[in-house]
A protein has these predicted regions:
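Active-site acidic catalytic loop and adjacent metal/ATP-binding pocket
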Residues: 4-13, 19, 148-200
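A glycine-centered beta->alpha junction motif in the catalytic cores
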Residues: 59-75, 91-95, 118-132, 206-209, ...
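A cross-family kinase active-site recognition segment
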Residues: 73-141, 164, 192, 276-278
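All-alpha amphipathic helical-bundle segments outside canonical DNA-binding/catalytic cores
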Residues: 104, 108, 238-251
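Active-site activation/catalytic loop segments of kinase-like enzymes and analogous catalytic loops
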Residues: 196-236, 251-271, 283
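Regulatory N- and C-terminal appendages and interdomain linkers associated
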Residues: 263-295
């Protein structure tokens, strides 16, 4: 049971059945999940029933979490077919932008992000200015100073020519199921439309946690997974341009994640909000790191 969703399971004569009830602010997950299952039934959970009005999903079991294969062994090879298939899905889903946006998921495409960033800086409460774990006045000034540079980063990333698509929003090893060679992607409650490479942020953070790595460490095995992910996108740009696009996507992904958390925290009650409020300023510090790395 979480603020954003409740999940329960029960055994049946047809195997384990899962029920999910999402919070009102995540109601778009229901319609999106239904659409994804319609377009890519072999890659998504099999739905038994949905109730879009109440935010309910009833789903069949699709195997064990990818995490159960990775964390005990510290072997990230099980990610190989997953990250390749995820890239293929993103490319295919780029043809369904209007339909996905019509489900109500957030529009965080590159053209809109500079304004969203400016609006974020106006929300002093979310930035926790001058508070413990919040932004200092110097950090806030740095945020302001980076506005025009961030706008240019978004423009440069768009210029590479990779179509925007679905970003899972929480693409880690507990949100992928595997069973008899079948890969299932699920839990689309944090999804939005933005640059596809934004998904790589949480993907690599998940690997950092699996391997007990320090932040921003990039191992040869992680580089291999990046190569595998980028390969399908070579239809849009040369490999060197794709690597440059990945670097440009890093500060963008920090801002997309910041906005997602800010909107989620705003919906929390006064008891729960302090537990998560620090995440917004911390993600902005991550943004600083990636912007500095580009200069």
């Amino acid at each position: 049971i979480r603020h954003w969703a409740t999940v329960m399971s029960v055994e049946s004569d047809q195997g384990e059945i899962f029920f999910k009830a999402v919070a009102p602010e995540s109601i778009s997950e229901i319609a999106l999940t239904e659409k994804l299952a319609e377009w890519y039934p072999d890659d998504m959970l099999q739905l038994i029933a949905i109730d879009a009005k109440n935010g309910w999903l009833l789903m069949r079991d699709a195997g064990e979490q990818l995490r159960s294969l990775i964390r005990p062994t510290k072997d990230i090879k099980p990610w190989v077919p997953v990250i390749q298939r995820y890239a293929e899905l993103q490319i295919g889903l780029s043809e369904h932008l209007d339909e996905m946006l019509n489900t109500g998921i957030p529009d965080r495409r590159l053209a809109s992000l500079p304004l969203i960033y400016t609006e974020l800086l106006a929300d002093k409460e979310s930035l926790m200015l001058g508070q413990e774990k919040g932004l200092s006045s110097d950090e806030f000034l740095k945020c302001q100073a980076l506005e025009s540079q961030f706008e240019q980063v978004c423009a440069d990333l768009a210029a590479v020519g990779i179509p925007e698509s679905l970003n899972h929003g929480d693409f880690h090893d507990a949100n992928v199921l595997v069973k008899d060679g079948r890969i299932t992607f699920f839990d689309w409650g944090d999804a939005d439309i933005t640059h596809p490479f934004v998904s790589l942020r949480t993907f690599f953070v998940s690997i950092e946690m699996s391997l007990d790595l320090d932040e921003y460490v990039f191992t040869p095995e992680m580089a291999e997974l990046l190569d595998i992910y980028l390969k399908p996108f070579e239809k849009y740009a040369p490999k060197d341009d794709l690597f440059r696009a990945y670097d440009l996507s890093k500060p963008v992904s920090s801002i997309v994640k910041t906005i997602a958390w800010k909107e989620s925290i705003t919906q929390m009650d006064e008891i729960m909000r302090p537990e998560y409020a620090w995440i917004v300023p911390e993600l902005l510090r991550e943004f600083f790191y990636h912007m500095d790395a580009l200069s």
